[in-house]
């Protein structure tokens, strides 16, 4: 077991002070300048490491170390305060592997309960970053305190995985323990959304799907954990060809709701052909707003080979419930897909305007249009058809009564 013996040593700054402290000669320095350690098991600050190989050297205020354990393999630099009057401590490192086990993610709570000004600047790179057992790819993180002391700023956060690349910037402010705020702006470039969901613990939810999810989010609290009841922001999604797979809604939750598997067979259009194996889409596009943990959209469009699905409504991210209005229009004229895509790309256009444009371009679709409401929990959504497709006069359906 290794204890923090560094409290026994005199810091270089105090050792070189003009007036030596009692018991020490002027310039006397007991802080080590070199440390080497090899251990099969090491416990430090209640953390257990195995297969430890450590080599460290100090020059003035700078510690440089090579370290290899079962969780870490890389090079670390620690630059303490004192190198100049305005500087802040800097922790930098380059790792071949950096792993934070699930049992240690809670340690960040204690770390981030301190004022942002007490945190060091960070410059971290890791070729293989593992968080709570999830292989997240290459990590790059740069963060520091603002010069005016107004917060801890994340100038760059990059996670680069074969399935996706996340780029973000953020700011954490803390006036008091009860008055913290985190703001994040990000872009998630998706190479394979299905693979990414599998990495995040939701396998067999989606097949393929490439595109981009971008937006800004803010919440009360520290960056380490999103506080859903205070979550607010805006999101934009543009996703390319893929397929929602047929899974139990309780497993895939909201993604399962969007796959529309729970919509039953209808008399005129047999939805089992469209949704039974999971909805295959060419594009999924739309914008959403988030306020107090509730996500709201007016223009989410899923464009498939057999049908176009337009969704408006809201989803409560904390209660895991939704109140959605769904319009299903069979694809009779495939050329209308570009019209729908262009319309939904404009956030000012709502679902009603978009449907009107589609029906004007192809009135025949009005015969086969279906409307549904999806309510209740994500695990057990309740689907109600709100517009029966049983027109007595097809001409009236297309052109209106004469």
Role assignments for model-derived ranges:
Residues 58:
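Conserved strand-loop elements at the edges of beta-sheets that form or border functional pockets
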Residues 6-22, 108-109, 391-402:
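Compositionally biased, proline/threonine/alanine/serine-rich low-complexity intrinsically disordered stretches
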Residues 62, 240, 398-401:
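Eukaryote-specific, cytoplasm-facing alpha-helical/coiled-coil scaffolding segments in long proteins
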Residues 24-29:
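Contiguous, function-dense segments enriched for cysteine-driven chemistry
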Residues 6-10, 31-45, 55, 64-135, ...:
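Small-residue helix/turn framework positions
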Residues 373-402:
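Gram-negative outer-membrane assembly/targeting C-terminal domains
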Residues 1-5:
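Short, exposed "boundary/linker" segments that immediately precede the start
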């Amino acid at each position: 077991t290794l204890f923090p013996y560094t409290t026994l040593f005199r810091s270089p700054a105090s050792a070189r002070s003009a007036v030596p402290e009692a018991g020490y000669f002027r310039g006397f320095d007991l802080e080590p300048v070199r440390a080497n350690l090899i251990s099969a098991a090491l416990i430090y600050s209640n953390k257990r490491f195995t297969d430890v190989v450590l080599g460290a050297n100090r020059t003035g205020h700078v510690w440089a170390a090579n370290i290899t354990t079962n969780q870490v393999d890389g090079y670390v630099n620690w630059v303490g305060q004192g190198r100049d009057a305005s500087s802040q401590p800097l922790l930098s490192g380059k790792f071949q592997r950096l792993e934070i086990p699930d049992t240690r993610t809670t340690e960040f709570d204690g770390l981030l309960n301190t004022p942002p000004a007490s945190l060091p600047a960070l410059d971290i790179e890791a070729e293989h970053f593992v968080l709570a057992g999830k292989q997240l790819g290459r990590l790059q993180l740069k963060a520091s305190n603002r010069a005016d002391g107004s917060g801890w700023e994340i100038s760059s956060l990059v996670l680069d995985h074969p399935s996706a690349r996340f780029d973000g910037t953020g700011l954490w402010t803390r006036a008091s323990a009860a008055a913290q705020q985190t703001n994040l702006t990000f872009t998630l470039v998706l190479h394979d959304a299905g693979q990414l969901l599998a990495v995040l613990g939701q396998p067999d939810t989606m097949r393929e799907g490439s595109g981009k999810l971008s937006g800004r989010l803010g919440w009360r609290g520290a960056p380490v954990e999103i506080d859903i009841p205070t979550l607010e922001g805006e999101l934009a999604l543009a996703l390319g060809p893929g397929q929602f797979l047929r899974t139990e809604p309780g497993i895939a939750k909201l993604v399962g709701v969007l796959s529309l598997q729970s919509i039953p067979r209808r008399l005129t259009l047999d939805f089992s052909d469209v949704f039974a194996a999971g909805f295959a889409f060419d594009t999924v596009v739309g914008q959403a707003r988030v306020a107090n943990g509730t996500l709201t959209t007016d223009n989410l469009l899923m464009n498939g080979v057999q049908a176009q699905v337009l969704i408006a409504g809201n989803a409560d991210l904390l209660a895991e419930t939704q109140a959605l209005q769904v319009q299903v229009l069979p694809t009779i004229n495939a050329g209308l897909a570009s019209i729908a895509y262009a319309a939904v790309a404009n956030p000012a256009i709502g679902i009603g305007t978009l449907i009107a444009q589609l029906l004007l371009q192809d009135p025949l679709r009005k015969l086969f249009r279906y409307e549904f409401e999806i309510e209740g929990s994500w695990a057990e959504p309740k689907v109600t058809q709100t517009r029966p497709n049983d027109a007595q006069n097809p001409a009236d359906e297309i052109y209106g009564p004469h």
